[in-house]
């Protein structure tokens, strides 16, 4: 069997649920969050601790639909939490600002593309490595 065949045979498309999970705070409540992230987190049994969106009414509606108790009024209020995973579901034009405000030593999930340009993507990567 070739190396490539061995690699393909051993690829996994499913992974075990972690034994210890962290609450998730979602920044941005657009279609991908409503249609994919929240249903997936619910199915996996992951706790969504809160939502933030510049359109608070949209975040409030989604929180009610998914029984999420906290809707934050600002990035800063959401980012005051440190023992969680941040799901940044933002348009590329807003990602750099959010990443700059992230607390240090946390985990974050990013949507693609990672910035509007290669330079902006590299800037975001550098900020992440510093934090």
Model-flagged regions — what are they?
Residues 1-2, 130:
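Polar low-complexity intrinsically disordered regions
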Residues 2-66:
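N-terminal Rossmann-like dinucleotide-binding module
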Residues 12-14, 34, 41, 49, ...:
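Generic detector of bulky aromatic hydrophobic side chains
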Residues 22, 46-47, 69-70, 106, ...:
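A structural micro-motif
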Residues 66, 70-127:
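Beta-loop-alpha module in the N-terminal Rossmann-like domain of NAD(P)-dependent dehydrogenases
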């Amino acid at each position: 069997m070739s190396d490539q065949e061995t690699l393909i045979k051993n690829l996994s498309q499913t992974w075990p649920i972690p034994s210890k999970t962290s609450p998730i705070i979602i920044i941005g409540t657009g279609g991908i969050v409503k249609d994919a992230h929240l249903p997936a987190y619910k199915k996996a049994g992951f706790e969504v601790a809160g939502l933030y969106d510049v359109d608070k009414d949209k975040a409030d509606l989604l929180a009610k639909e998914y029984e999420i108790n906290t809707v934050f009024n600002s990035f800063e209020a959401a980012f005051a939490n440190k023992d969680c995973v941040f799901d940044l579901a933002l348009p590329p034009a807003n990602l750099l600002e959010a990443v700059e405000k992230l607390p240090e030593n946390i985990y974050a999930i990013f949507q693609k593309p990672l910035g509007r340009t290669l330079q902006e993507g590299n800037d975001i990567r550098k900020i992440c490595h510093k934090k």
